[in-house]
Amino acid sequence: MSILRTIAMFIYLFGYMILHYGILRRAERAAAAGDTATVEQIVNQHIPRWSRGILKVTGVSLSVEGLENIPKDRPCVFVANHRSYYDIPLLLAGLEKPHGILAKEELEKIPLLNRWMKLLGCVFVQRDDVRASVRALNDATAIVESGRSFIIFPEGTRYKGEEGGAGEFKAGAFRIAVKTGAPVVPVAISGARGLFEARGNRATPGTVYVPVSYTHLRAHETELHL
């Protein structure tokens, strides 16, 4: 059954994007014309729907607590732990609206997905290239400065250790919050890895818990940890 769910996940993942290709093109034309309202309307409708569909076909239930802690009057930087491929659709489905993500460059090579991610405001980073990483962080900073929230995985890659653990946080990711003065919203994803990677990359039903907290770190306080 887990094999069938995994196959269904990939069929749905790309099938949705193929079936809605016309909508993707409409959003891209709107972006080229500077019609940000249309782009936002399309992104806010389809990306959460696509993400929820991935969870549904794989039998994953999402339990989110603390959405009331997200600031409503200003952009923020969501800081999430990273343990599973599920993490991105979980955040896109679970937060109050989808936000751009600091994502690894490999995702930019996936057809259709890369175009939706660019519309969302994702920034792709070459983790082994210092200059490219700095440019990516500057691009992400500009997005927050424009009034849009952003998601970062400060570990820089998926942590493969025991549940509840975390990898080493990369200081550079926090500079987005430092430079913009945006509040940091920690997001803890629990249980995702056990439903896929720990099962030999086979989709397994279960529940993922995502508590959302809030902290407003002032720039000089954050710099002490960089």
Give short role names for the model-derived ranges.
Residues H20-A33, E40-N44, K56-T58, K72-V130:
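Catalytic core of membrane glycerolipid acyltransferases/transacylases, capturing the structured
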Residues S51, C122-Q126, T157-R158:
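Short, basic, glycine/proline-bearing loop/turn elements
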Residues V125, V187, V212:
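Hydrophobic residues at beta-strand termini and immediately following loops
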Residues V130, V134-R202, Y209:
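Membrane-associated lipid acylation/remodeling enzymes share a hydrophobic transmembrane-juxtamembrane segment
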Residues T215-L224:
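Conserved small/polar residues in nucleotide/adenosyl-binding loops
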